[in-house]
């Protein structure tokens, strides 16, 4: 079931850099994959994506251009999984305005392609683990008690939805110690 509160988010500092550096020669995409022991059940994979969407509103999202800058928006409609085609197919600004993530499948493989502005590698792995857990829970009635797997029924923590770099830089106090003696002097 696909349902959650539609939200807008400011891009964090790193995401803004990815948007500024994006061009036709560098797509800022990365892919994570999982290999299953049996063929992917497409209906269960789609159901799993729908189920975890509310848990990851900043990943199941698109990137829109605002008046002054880009912003992130959780998807209003379900993210549809696709059969794998081209590896890391670039995302144009038009594509990003609709979705900044692709979930692909092919035989025994599940791939997730992320536009780097929505998450980094660690966030991608957290998302992949949650998706695979939800898939196995629905397919095999599997239950795993592992605190590193974020469950679909939990809501995101406030800290997950803000720019972590802001807290790091505002709490950082550094005072340079300068040598006040001149090392050389030019004279007439």
Where in the sequence are the language-model features?
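Flexible, P/S/T/G-rich "lid" or insertion loops adjacent to the active sites of thioester-utilizing
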Residues: 159-188
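Non-catalytic N-terminal regions of enzymes
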Residues: 1-164
């Amino acid at each position: 079931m696909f349902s959650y509160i539609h939200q807008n988010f400011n891009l964090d500092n790193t995401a803004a850099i990815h948007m500024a550096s994006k061009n036709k020669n560098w797509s800022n995409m990365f892919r994570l994959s999982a290999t299953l022991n049996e063929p992917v059940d497409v209906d269960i994979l789609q159901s799993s994506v729908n189920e975890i969407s509310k848990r990851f509103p900043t990943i199941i999202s698109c990137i829109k251009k605002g008046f002054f800058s880009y912003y992130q928006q959780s998807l209003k409609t379900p993210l549809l999984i696709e059969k794998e085609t081209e590896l890391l197919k670039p995302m144009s600004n038009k594509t990003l305005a609709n979705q900044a993530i692709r979930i692909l499948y092919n035989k025994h493989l599940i791939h997730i392609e992320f536009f780097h502005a929505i998450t980094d590698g660690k966030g991608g792995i957290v998302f992949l683990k949650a998706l695979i857990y939800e898939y196995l829970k629905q397919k095999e009635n599997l239950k795993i008690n592992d605190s590193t797997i974020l469950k679909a029924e939990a809501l995101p923590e406030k800290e997950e939805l803000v720019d972590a770099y802001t807290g790091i830089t505002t709490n950082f106090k550094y005072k340079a110690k300068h040598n006040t003696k001149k090392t050389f002097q030019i004279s007439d």
